[in-house]
Amino acid sequence: MLPTVPFGELNITRLIVGGNPFRGNSHLNAQLSTEMLEFFTVERIKKTLAACEAHGINTVQARGDVLIQACLREYWAEGGRLHFIAQTASELRDLSGHVKQLARFGAVGIYVHGTFTDRHFLEGTFQ
């Protein structure tokens, strides 16, 4: 097992799986983002999660969107045990409802995506 840190009542590995590649967010260039989207099918996402878990990682941090939730639902149904830290999906307008849905889904942690926070801060509508 990899080194862990306390996270509420859980211990999560200090190394966690990041979900940006699964959704084509390379932060490098559009071509790489496109290649990631083409490569990471549902099956490849689940295989990647399983490989990470097999190597001792116990947590994934990813968007809490419909695709990622579907992948995780299948992964968990097939015996996967990764903890899920969810980032809110900026395209969903009901932030409070989305956070509640992610909690019901099983996210062990939820954070608001930075673009949502930035936009509301700049508009003076941050609550």
Positions of predicted regions on the chain:
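A cross-domain feature marking catalytic cores of carbohydrate-active enzymes
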Residues: 19-21, 62-64, 86-90, 112-114
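Generic hydrophobic alpha-helical segments
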Residues: 48, 98-99
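Generic structural signal for hydrophobic
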Residues: 51-52, 101-104
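Positively charged, amphipathic N-terminal segments that serve as targeting/anchoring signals
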Residues: 54, 109-110, 115-116, 125
